[in-house]
């Protein structure tokens, strides 16, 4: 009887050892569409804080195809600040969480305009893991001559593969449609797109696609075409640029954030306490107030916002989720 017990213990220990070895074997995880930091941390038996620490994440925002470290020690930022060289000429930098074009440009003694030119970017959106050219000459492959032609599909409609630097408004302008139509065709309820993503640009929405029509239902939304005169790197500077990117340009004369609700109302915008994708969250709290861009409205009532000069230095783009119970603390400019 004693021998059987010992054998059982040995067998159980062996199985546990194999399971532990298999779990430890996975050191990285490639993010899949729809995944969250919670789901990934739960899968590998680590805390969200540990997962964020391993990958130097400053928010819970992750992107499809992003490679995350799930075991080991945290990445050193000293190596990430050194650009890698390429046999084709020029140096490259891998975007880290919290980076912005201006921040990267200052690291390498160049301008954000030059980095945009080198990489064929036409907006300020970058994402962790993206490889950017920071010196050399612009590659001819950055021209979007081929990518601007949508592929056809036997199921009806045409499709476009998202390139680095694309936005929904930019894609819509290429194909003579609206960003709202593209959102409807693809069942999108926020403005997040990523390189390699396949978007339907013509045809009819599939039966399982969600509708994005609620993003601006019944709202007065004047559109301005002003130059951005807000102070670089401030919350107002970022929100002005994000609204321009989605084709809903705002005035450059609303001054400090604590004046935006009154100024927007005077310009004819709808102001209420209901967040929608693309709206501006505004508060008078603080000396100058604060504004944020609503990127996503979650099913639980919380919202994902992008902002500058809140939890990081001016010019650094950050994301955070505002809990549902705090959503009504803000006014929303539509």
Swiss-Prot record:
Domain Peptidase C51: 210-334
Record SMART domains: LysM
Residues annotated as domain LysM: 27-70, 91-134, 158-201
Subcellular location: Secreted; Cell surface
Reaction catalysis annotation: Hydrolyzes the link between N-acetylmuramoyl residues and L-amino acid residues in certain cell-wall glycopeptides
GO biological process: cell wall organization; defense response to bacterium; division septum assembly; killing of cells of another organism
Main location: secreted
Molecular function GO terms recorded: lytic endotransglycosylase activity; N-acetylmuramoyl-L-alanine amidase activity
Gene behind the chain: sle1
Induction, as annotated: Repressed by mgrA. More protein is secreted in a secG mutant (at protein level).
E.C. no: 3.5.1.28
Leader sequence residues: 1-25
Keyword Disulfide bond attached: no
Superkingdom, taxonomy of origin: Bacteria
Keyword annotations of the record: Antimicrobial, Bacteriolytic enzyme, Cell cycle, Cell division, Cell wall biogenesis/degradation, Hydrolase, Repeat, Secreted, Septation, Signal, Virulence
Role: Peptidoglycan hydrolase involved in the splitting of the septum during cell division. Binds to both alpha and beta-chains of human fibrinogen as well as fibronectin, which suggests a role in the colonization of host factor-coated material or host tissue. Also exhibits lytic activity against S.carnosus and S.aureus cells but not against M.luteus cells.
InterPro entries in alphabetical order: CHAP_dom, LysM_dom, LysM_dom_sf, Papain-like_cys_pep_sf
Region ranges (Disordered): 71-90
Gene Ontology CC: cell surface; extracellular region
Keyword Repeat among UniProt keywords: yes
Low complexity bias locations: 71-86
Protein name, as recorded: N-acetylmuramoyl-L-alanine amidase sle1
Pfam families, sorted: CHAP, LysM
TM stretches of this protein: none
SUPFAM superfamilies: Cysteine proteinases, LysM domain
């Amino acid at each position: 009887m004693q021998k059987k017990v010992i054998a059982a213990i040995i067998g159980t220990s062996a199985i546990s050892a194999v399971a532990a070895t298999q779990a430890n074997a996975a050191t990285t995880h490639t993010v899949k569409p729809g995944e969250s930091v919670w789901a990934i941390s739960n899968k590998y038996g680590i805390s969200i804080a540990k997962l964020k620490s391993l990958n130097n994440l400053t928010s819970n925002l992750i992107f499809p195809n992003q490679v995350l470290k799930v075991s080991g020690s945290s990445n050193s930022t000293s190596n990430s600040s050194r650009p890698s060289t390429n046999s084709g000429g020029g140096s490259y930098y891998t975007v880290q969480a919290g980076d912005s074009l201006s921040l990267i440009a200052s690291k390498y003694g160049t301008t954000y305009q030059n980095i945009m030119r080198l990489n064929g970017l036409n907006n300020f959106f970058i994402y962790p893991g993206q490889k950017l050219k920071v010196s050399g000459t612009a590659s001819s492959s950055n021209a979007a001559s081929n990518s601007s032609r949508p592929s056809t599909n036997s199921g009806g409609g045409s499709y476009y593969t998202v390139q680095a630097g694309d936005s929904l408004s930019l894609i819509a302008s290429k194909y003579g449609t609206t960003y709202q139509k593209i959102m409807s065709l693809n069942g999108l309820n926020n403005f997040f797109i990523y390189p390699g993503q396949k978007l339907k640009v013509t045809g009819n929405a599939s039966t399982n696609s969600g509708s994005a029509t609620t993003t601006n239902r019944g709202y007065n939304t004047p559109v301005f075409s002003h130059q951005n005169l807000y102070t670089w790197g401030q919350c107002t500077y970022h929100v002005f640029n994000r609204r321009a990117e989605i084709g809903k340009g705002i005035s450059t004369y609303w001054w400090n954030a604590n004046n935006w609700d009154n100024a927007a109302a005077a310009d004819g915008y709808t102001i209420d306490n209901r967040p929608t994708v693309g709206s501006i969250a505004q508060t008078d709290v603080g000396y100058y107030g604060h504004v944020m861009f609503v990127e996503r409205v979650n099913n639980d009532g919380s919202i994902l916002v992008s902002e500058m000069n809140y939890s990081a230095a001016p010019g650094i783009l950050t994301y955070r989720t505002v809990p549902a119970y705090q959503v009504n603390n803000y006014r929303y400019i539509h």
